[in-house]
UniProtKB/Swiss-Prot annotation:
Spans annotated as Hydrophobic: 39-110
Listed Gly residues bias regions: 158-172
Name of the molecule in the record: Oleosin 18 kDa
A GO CC term assigned to this protein in UniProt: membrane
Organism: Oryza sativa subsp. indica (Rice)
Keywords noted in UniProt: Acetylation, Lipid droplet, Membrane, Repeat, Transmembrane, Transmembrane helix
InterPro entries: Oleosin
Length: 172
């Protein structure tokens, strides 16, 4: 009965050590909710701004190509020409602003990802070291259990051999 109690205590102790080992392997600091929300917001926003930048640039070029001959042929007055130039400049500035916003958003996202990946090797090395320690500990405990079983087998063998040899046969 005492052996069972010791085995139960041993199991509970080993189970606690394994739990601590697993906790040690997992990263202690995960991305916060605000960081995850930032990434989830900025990535689509950056892509959308880049798409809008491209559309604004394309619309400016097409509008300039279509409106220039119309204004020159039908109304050679300075007001429509100034309007045309103003709209073209506004289109190019809008395109540049949207492109700059998209690029800055994606740059921030790339820097955040780079910083996260630079921290990862520390966690990997720490996990590798803890796994090696756990494997060495398991090997040590296995060797102890093997020695204990060997000792019990030796005791059982010497106890049976000391019984007087009632079942042995001698030849004359």
């Amino acid at each position: 009965m005492a052996d069972r109690d010791r085995a139960g205590q041993y199991y509970q102790q080993q189970r606690g050590q394994v739990g601590e080992t697993v906790k040690g392997i997992l990263p202690e600091k995960a991305p916060s909710a605000s960081q995850a929300l930032t990434v989830a917001t900025l990535f689509p926003l950056g892509g959308l701004l880049l798409v809008l930048s491209g559309l604004a640039l394309a619309a400016s070029v097409v509008g300039l190509a279509v409106a220039t001959p119309v204004f020159l042929i039908f109304s050679p007055v300075l007001v429509p020409a100034a309007l045309l130039i103003g709209l073209a400049v506004a289109g190019f500035l809008t395109s540049g602003a949207l492109g700059l916003g998209g690029l800055s958003s994606l740059t921030f996202l790339a820097n955040t990802a780079r910083q996260a990946f630079q921290r990862t090797p520390d966690y990997v090395e720490q996990a590798r070291r803890r796994m090696a320690e756990a494997a060495a500990h398991a090997g040590h405990k296995t060797a102890q259990a093997g020695h204990a079983i060997q000792g019990r087998a030796d005791q059982a063998g010497t106890g049976a051999g000391a019984g007087g040899g009632a079942g042995t046969k001698t030849s004359s």
